[in-house]
Amino acid sequence: PNVIVIQEPVKEWLSITDENGRNFLEVFYEDKKRWSYTFQNLAYLTRMKLLFDALDNINTITFKNIWNRILGNKFIIISERSILTDKNTFAKMLKDSDDMNNMEYSLYNKCFPVLLNRVKMSNVIYLQTDPTKSFERLTFRNRNEEKKIPLGYIESVNEYHNKWLCNNDDIRVLILDGNNDFETDDIKNKLNLITMISKIKEF
């Protein structure tokens, strides 16, 4: 099959700034109660745009390439994070912490029928990672907007991901160990990567 990979639209989030030059990531982490609803909508819109662009690209390729049409070649879209992840983890977490009020949360959830009428998510690959490892990677990434994120926030994100994806009978979920460091030349990590790829192919 042909594979299209959709990356996190973080460049879009960083490109929109206020009069003081602060971008959306920065103001969100500084004041979640003020910016949670706005940022979650931005995340939804930018992810949806990338997904729809990918679908339009597939339709164009299929239309132009007669062999794709004759052979019925399949396309697989792999998104860095599902829009449903935003809905079931980040937005719900912000609602439960009172950073997003009831009216905002209700309005936010009204967006999703627009997406789900066009797109059906088939599978989820969950790279389950210890919060301390995620925090370590976030610190190493050294993104200026994320420097004040506490470990507690990462632990909450992990908790909500686990609640949604572990033992979820409504979605096909492949849970993989995300704690391995695949950027090193360690033979054990390379073998773990090979095993992980094999599981994904079987999935």
Each predicted region: which residue ranges?
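NTP-dependent small-molecule kinase module
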Residues: F135-F203
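Glycine-rich phosphate-binding loop used to anchor ATP phosphates in small-molecule kinases
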Residues: R34-V119
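Conserved nucleotide-binding/hydrolysis micro-motifs of P-loop NTPases
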Residues: V10-W13, I83-T85, T129-S134, N180-F182
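A glycine- and Lys/Arg-enriched "phosphate-lid" helix/loop adjacent to the NTP-binding pocket
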Residues: K87-E159
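Short aromatic-enriched loop/helix-cap "lid" or pocket-rim segments at secondary-structure transitions
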Residues: I16-G21, T89-K92, E136-T139, I187-N189
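Conserved substrate/cofactor phosphate-moiety recognition/catalytic segment
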Residues: N2-Q40
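Short glycine-/polar-rich loops that comprise or flank the Walker A/P-loop
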Residues: K74, R118-N123, D169-R172
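Hydrophobic/aromatic beta-strand patches that form the interior of the parallel beta-sheet core
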Residues: I6, N123-I125, R172-L176
